[in-house]
Amino acid sequence: MEPLYQQTNKQVQEIQSHMGRLERADKQSVHLVENEIQASIEQIFSHLERLEILSSKEPLNRRQNAKLRVDQLKYDVQHLQTALRNFQHRRQVREQQERQRDELLSRTFTTNDSDTTIPMDESLQFNSSLHNIHHGMDDLIGGGHSILEGLRAQRLTLKGTQKKILDIANMLGLSNTVMRLIEKRAFQDKYFMIGGMLLTCAVMFLVVQYLT
């Protein structure tokens, strides 16, 4: 199990460095970097399935620790997957807006009688602004949805990790005071997560109200 764990952990660290390279990539290479990162993430998920099987076969005194290490890797790669999806969503919206802006700037109206062209007037510019506002709202909603999905995935992972920590605490014979502190911290983390979700929704609502 250990060689596969070390290999997978190294891949996670490499993806973290590639995410920084993704932010600096130009339009010609950004798709290649995205595909490279996605392929690595899929390979890591495959390794994690194998590691979960191997961790369940570890000796009893090492099994819980092995599962915790696998859960930490799973949490890290889920976070990276969410970050990649958010980046792709922002890039796609930005590229779509650029295409629409170029189309609007190059669009002219031609009369039936001659080749005379009529430049874009204020009404068309106003419609263009409304169109961009609608796409901006879609971008906010899509980004908020991605954030909420990421929080849900992290909550499930943390919930499983908390249960394993409590199991280890019982095995090691930790005091009830220590276990209560662990449960209190998990309870506080839950409210922090809910507060973050409510704050995100409030910001999205205020931005939509401002834009409309």
Curated annotation (Swiss-Prot):
<dbReference type="GO" id="GO:0005789">
    <property type="term" value="C:endoplasmic reticulum membrane"/>
</dbReference>
<keyword id="KW-0812">Transmembrane</keyword>
<keyword id="KW-0472">Membrane</keyword>
<comment type="subunit">
    <text>Part of a unique SNARE complex composed of the Golgi SNAREs GOSR1, STX5 and YKT6. Interacts with BET1.</text>
</comment>
<feature type="transmembrane region" description="Helical; Anchor for type IV membrane protein">
    <location>
        <begin position="191"/>
        <end position="211"/>
    </location>
</feature>
<dbReference type="GO" id="GO:0031201">
    <property type="term" value="C:SNARE complex"/>
</dbReference>
<feature type="short sequence motif" description="IxM motif; signal for cargo packaging into COPII-coated vesicles">
    <location>
        <begin position="118"/>
        <end position="120"/>
    </location>
</feature>
<keyword id="KW-0007">Acetylation</keyword>
<keyword id="KW-0333">Golgi apparatus</keyword>
<protein>
    <recommendedName>
        <fullName>Golgi SNAP receptor complex member 2</fullName>
    </recommendedName>
</protein>
<dbReference type="GO" id="GO:0016192">
    <property type="term" value="P:vesicle-mediated transport"/>
</dbReference>
<keyword id="KW-0813">Transport</keyword>
<dbReference type="GO" id="GO:0000139">
    <property type="term" value="C:Golgi membrane"/>
</dbReference>
<feature type="topological domain" description="Cytoplasmic">
    <location>
        <begin position="1"/>
        <end position="190"/>
    </location>
</feature>
<dbReference type="Pfam" id="PF12352">
    <property type="entry name" value="V-SNARE_C"/>
</dbReference>
<keyword id="KW-0653">Protein transport</keyword>
<feature type="coiled-coil region">
    <location>
        <begin position="60"/>
        <end position="92"/>
    </location>
</feature>
<dbReference type="GO" id="GO:0015031">
    <property type="term" value="P:protein transport"/>
</dbReference>
<keyword id="KW-0256">Endoplasmic reticulum</keyword>
<comment type="similarity">
    <text>Belongs to the GOSR2 family.</text>
</comment>
<dbReference type="InterPro" id="IPR027027">
    <property type="entry name" value="GOSR2/Membrin/Bos1"/>
</dbReference>
<dbReference type="GO" id="GO:0005829">
    <property type="term" value="C:cytosol"/>
</dbReference>
<feature type="topological domain" description="Vesicular">
    <location>
        <position position="212"/>
    </location>
</feature>
<keyword id="KW-0175">Coiled coil</keyword>
<dbReference type="GO" id="GO:0006891">
    <property type="term" value="P:intra-Golgi vesicle-mediated transport"/>
</dbReference>
<dbReference type="GO" id="GO:0005654">
    <property type="term" value="C:nucleoplasm"/>
</dbReference>
<keyword id="KW-1133">Transmembrane helix</keyword>
<dbReference type="GO" id="GO:0005484">
    <property type="term" value="F:SNAP receptor activity"/>
</dbReference>
<feature type="modified residue" description="N-acetylmethionine">
    <location>
        <position position="1"/>
    </location>
</feature>
<comment type="function">
    <text>Involved in transport of proteins from the cis/medial-Golgi to the trans-Golgi network.</text>
</comment>
